[in-house]
UniProtKB/Swiss-Prot annotation:
Species: Oryza sativa subsp. japonica
Family, per entry: Belongs to the protein kinase superfamily. Ser/Thr protein kinase family.
Protein name: LRR receptor-like serine/threonine-protein kinase SIK1
Phenotypic consequence of gene deletion: Normal growth, but increased number of stomata in adaxial and abaxial leaf epidermis. Increased sensitivity to salt and drought stresses.
Name of the gene encoding the protein in the UniProt record: SIK1
Record-level Gene Ontology MF annotations: ATP binding; protein serine kinase activity; receptor serine/threonine kinase binding; transmembrane receptor protein serine/threonine kinase activity
Single GO cellular component term: membrane
Keywords from the UniProt entry: ATP-binding, Cell membrane, Glycoprotein, Kinase, Leucine-rich repeat, Membrane, Nucleotide-binding, Receptor, Repeat, Serine/threonine-protein kinase, Signal, Stress response, Transferase, Transmembrane, Transmembrane helix
Modification after translation, per record: Autophosphorylated.
């Protein structure tokens, strides 16, 4: 009987196994064609996936598709990483068919539409990041079905509606980041009963209601950020029970009342309460919060004195108390805060003197005491704060003189002593603070002459000495202020004539000299200040005629009022005669002008004739008595040309051949006899050292050849002017294309990356392969020229000193451009190869953002650092990059590289060889020797939870090559302000 049943049992087993195999093959159990079809459904929702997901072609092996990670046994899709691919369209409901999905990262795209309800069908999901898109609508309640979910990141979208209270039903949720959306309503109280929640980010929404006492129920919550909402009420008295908090930010809401005393029981590293309506005094107990690194109570309505016990906060680096109604004196005990780098007490009602104890703060970077009622002198030992970068005491009642020791503050870039009662002479030592970009001494009682040494501040952007009692002339040395944009010395007693050297200020926007005693004529050279938009010379004793240059016609009559001997030419009816200026010229005067012009023309023609006559050499000298300059030829394409040929081909350097201006030169285009075009650079100033030494340097530079360097073809040095002959670049400079007024050519991502690679390779050659090695010293976007194929060529390295083959490669020759200069230069006054690396990092930021290095008061590097601190760097990407880049992960890596290049300490920066190699690794696979691959299984395995990410930004570097990966590991993650 048993033997008879055996065949039937065998057939039953075969049928069961067959059905199971069939189900597995159809996708019912995990992988297979079912999930492949689901992925194709997901792709169909994306509007522009053709390029980014080119391998998503419906083929059999969906596990090999870009961004897809599968289980090795069942082939079920476990992870989907399509971040930073510039994807548009919507998230398809088909994603809900991927039942085994554990990891979804779609951040940094341009996805629109609503989050599909079907996302709740991905029941195995542990990590969901949809941040940095354009998603709108409500947060779907179906997300609460994801019982395995640990991290939910939806920040930086356009989501609306309330926060679903059902999110509290996700038992394993550790990270909830909904920042920078448009969410409304109260914060659900049930959220605070999730026992495992560690990170709650709700900043930048429109949430209302109050702070719930239940917020302290979360024993594991370390990050609580509700900054920038519409919360009201008071800070809960139970706030002291939030003992797990490390970051507490409730700033920029409408919180009122007093700061609870038991807030001192917190052990937070950051306590940020600014921008609310808090009243009362600062609790003394805050001075016991030893873990504080940042204390921000600014922009409230706090009263009373600053507690002296705050001096016990020995680990606090930032103390912001500005914008309150604080009274009393500045506690001397603040000098004990040895780690303090930012101290802002401005806009209060403080009295007394500036305590000398502040001079002990060796790490102090910014000191702002403006708009108080402080009296007395500036303590001399403030000059001991050698790291000080900004010092502002505007709007007090300080007196005395400027301490001579200020010259020790080599890092100082901003000095504002305006609207006080300072007296005496302006010390000439201020000219030694070589990194100053703003000097404001206005509205004081300074007297005596203006120090000529101020002309040494070559990085100065704004100079304001108005409303004092200064006398003497305007120093001719001001012509050296090549970066200056504003000069205001109005309402003084200045005398003498205007120096013609002011005409060298190519960046000057405003020149304000009204209400002085200036005499003489307005120098015609001022017409060379092509950036000048605001000119006021009224109420002086100027004479002669206003220059008739085109750019002077834009200035109104009011610019020249109160100069009885000054003739102003009216060019339209708008100037009128109502102001009493002389506008009529007699016939006799006209005849004299014409006669004088004829005589001048004759003298000029005679001088030209004599100049062109050959002159004998002076015995024993290599210089002719007079005659045309010699042309030194360094490349064969100029071998048949003479100096006279160049002058003839450019019509004596006629304006119509000008193709650009610089701070120290004008550039002309010249077409040689062969038809080849070259660029002729005419230097404004003569070489100050041995002419033969300069020739030797130029001959050395002319011998350097590299595909990414602009070649020097020849030069001509003489009292007539120094001319340098370079390659002509059809597409001008990178600065012109990024920031110029026309911007005719849009630079896509691939072009920008190739430009960065080319410039890096050129600079790497100068640093490492050139003999002698050369430090450029002025790397900037205007010194990166582009040929007809947009290949980058580094120019102006000829002005650098050659580095000898010794162990030290530093030099003391001062060069650089504001915005690009290494901060370390402020401390040491020395530049080296790593200074060039810093400048290149700024150029790379320009390429990525399309923004200028310095624009008015905005500093690109500081902007990116602040965004790095908020983990919003990708918001700064230029729109043309976003549109044309198919893998935004490459852009993030480029940002990382730029921030590595601009680290504060030179030893932490890479070399240019390393920079060039990493940039090469970012080029498209077709340009690489080996194709790039991305190991997403490694990413999935190493996904870091929020609890492990404190203070760090998790970014997948990819697996470009082992050496590149080691390089990134060597220098570490950089999207953290503490590592800059």
């Amino acid at each position: 009987m048993a033997a008879a049943r055996a065949p039937w049992l065998w057939w039953w087993v075969v049928v069961v196994v067959g059905v199971a195999v069939a189900e597995a093959a159809s996708g019912g159990g995990g992988g297979g064609d079912g999930e492949g079809k689901a992925l194709m459904g997901v792709k169909a929702g994306f509007g522009n996936a053709a390029n980014a997901l080119v391998d998503w072609d419906g083929g059999a092996d969906h596990c090999a598709w870009r961004g897809v990670t599968c289980d090795n046994a069942s082939f079920a899709v476990l992870a989907l990483n399509l971040s930073n691919l510039n994807l548009g369209g919507e998230i398809s409901p088909a994603i809900g068919e991927l039942k085994n999905l554990q990891f979804v990262d779609l951040k940094g795209n341009k996805l629109t539409g609503q989050i599909p309800d079907e996302i709740g069908d991905c029941i195995s999901l542990k990590y969901l990041d949809l941040s940095g898109n354009l998603l709108y609508g409500d947060i779907p309640f179906s997300i609460s079905k994801l019982k395995q979910l640990e991290e939910l990141i939806l920040k930086n979208n356009q989501l609306t509606g309330p926060i679903p209270s059902t999110l509290s039903q996700i038992p394993n949720l550790k990270t909830l980041d909904l920042a920078q959306n448009q969410l409304t309503g109260d914060i659900p109280r049930l959220i605070y009963w999730n026992e495992v929640l560690q990170y709650l980010g709700l900043r930048g929404n429109s949430l209302t209601g109050t702070l719930s006492p239940d917020m302290c129920q979360l024993t594991g919550l370390w990050y609580f950020d509700v900054r920038g909402n519409n919360l009201t009420g008071t800070i809960p008295e139970s706030i002291g029970n939030c003992t797990s908090f490390e970051i507490l930010d409730i700033s920029y809401n409408q919180i009122s009342g007093e700061i609870p005393y038991n807030i001192g029981f917190l052990q937070v590293a950051t306590l940020s309460l600014q921008g609310n309506r808090l009243t009362g005094k600062i609790p003394d107990v805050i001075g016991l919060m030893q873990a504080l690194a940042v204390l921000d109570l600014s922009e409230n309505e706090l009263v009373g004195p600053i507690p002296s016990i705050l001096g016990n906060l020995s680990y606090t680096g930032k103390l912001y108390l500005h914008g309150n109604k604080l009274t009393g004196v500045i506690p001397p005990e603040l000098g004990n805060m040895s780690k303090l780098s930012y101290l802002q007490l401005n806009d209060n009602e403080l009295v007394g003197t500036i305590p000398a104890e502040l001079g002990k703060l060796e790490e102090l970077f910014e000191l702002n005491l403006a708009n108080n009622n402080l009296q007395g002198p500036i303590p001399a030992n403030i000059s001991s704060c050698t790291a000080l970068n900004k010092f502002n005491v505007y709007g007090n009642k300080l007196n005395g003189s400027i301490p001579a020791g200020f010259q020790k503050l080599e890092s100082l870039t901003y000095l504002n002593l305006s609207s006080n009662n300072f007296k005496g002479n302006i010390p000439s030592e201020l000219g030694h603070i070589i990194n100053l970009d703003t000097l404001d001494l206005s509205y004081n009682e300074f007297s005596g002459p203006v120090p000529a040494t101020i002309g040494d501040l070559e990085h100065l952007l704004e100079l304001n000495l108005s409303k004092n009692h200064l006398d003497g002339p305007v120093p001719a040395e001001f012509g050296n202020l090549r970066s200056v944009q504003v000069i205001d010395m109005s309402n003084n007693n200045l005398s003498g004539s205007l120096p013609e050297e002011l005409g060298q200020l190519q960046n000057l926007d405003s020149l304000i000299l009204n209400n002085n005693n200036l005499v003489g004529e307005i120098p015609a050279q001022l017409a060379n200040c092509f950036s000048l938009n605001n000119l006021n010379l009224s109420y002086n004793n100027l004479s002669g005629h206003v220059p008739m240059a085109k750019n002077f016609s834009k200035f109104p009559m009011e610019s020249f009022l109160g100069n009885p001997l000054l003739h102003v030419y009216c060019q339209d009816s708008s100037c009128g005669h109502s102001h009493g200026q002389r506008v009529n010229i007699s016939k006799t005067a006209i005849a004299c002008i014409i006669l004088g012009f004829i005589i001048l023309l004759c003298v000029l023609l005679l001088a030209i004739y004599k100049t062109n006559q050959p002159q004998p050499l002076v015995k024993g000298s290599d210089k002719p008595v007079q005659g045309p300059p010699k042309l030194v030829v360094l490349q064969m394409d100029m071998a048949i040309h003479t100096y006279e040929d160049i002058m003839r081909l450019t019509e004596n350097l006629s304006e119509k051949y000008i193709i650009g201006y610089g701070a120290s030169s004008t550039v002309y285009k010249c077409e040689l006899k062969s038809g080849k075009a070259i660029a002729v650079k005419r230097l404004y100033s003569q070489y100050n050292h041995s002419l033969r030494e300069f020739e030797t340097e130029l001959e050395t530079i002319g011998s350097i050849r590299h595909r990414n360097l602009v070649s020097l073809h020849g030069f001509s040095l003489s009292p007539h002017g120094n001319l340098l002959f370079y390659d002509y670049m059809e597409n001008g400079s990178l600065w012109d294309l990024l920031h110029g007024p026309s911007k005719k050519v849009k630079l896509n991502w691939d072009t920008r990356l190739r430009i960065a690679v080319g410039a890096a390779q050129g600079l790497a050659y100068l640093h490492h392969d050139c003999n002698p090695r050369i430090i450029h010293r002025d790397v900037k976007s205007s010194n990166i020229l582009l040929d007809e194929n947009f290949e980058a060529h580094l120019s102006d390295f000829g002005i650098a000193k050659c580095v000898p083959s010794a162990k030290s490669h530093a030099s003391t020759y001062v060069l650089g451009t504001i915005g690009y200069i290494d901060p370390e230069y402020a401390r040491t006054s020395r530049l080296n190869e790593k200074s060039d690396v810093y400048s290149f990092g700024i150029v790379l930021l320009e390429l990525l953002t399309g923004k200028k290095a310095v624009d008015n008061e905005s500093n690109l590097h500081q902007l990116i650092l602040s965004k790095a601190d908020d983990n919003t760097v990708m918001e700064a990407v230029d729109s043309e990059v976003s549109v044309t880049c198919t893998d935004m992960g490459l852009v993030r890596k480029a940002f990382q590289l730029a921030l590595l290049c601009t680290k504060r300490h030179p030893s932490d920066r890479p070399t240019m060889h390393e920079v060039a190699r990493v940039l090469l690794s970012l080029l498209p696979a077709s340009a690489m020797t080996t194709p790039k691959t991305v190991d997403y299984s490694r990413l999935l395995a190493s996904t870091t939870t929020a609890a492990d990410m404190r203070g760090h930004d998790v970014t997948d570097i990819g697996d470009n090559s082992s050496s590149d990966e080691q390089w990134f590991v060597r220098f570490g993650e950089v999207i953290s302000k503490h590592t800059m």
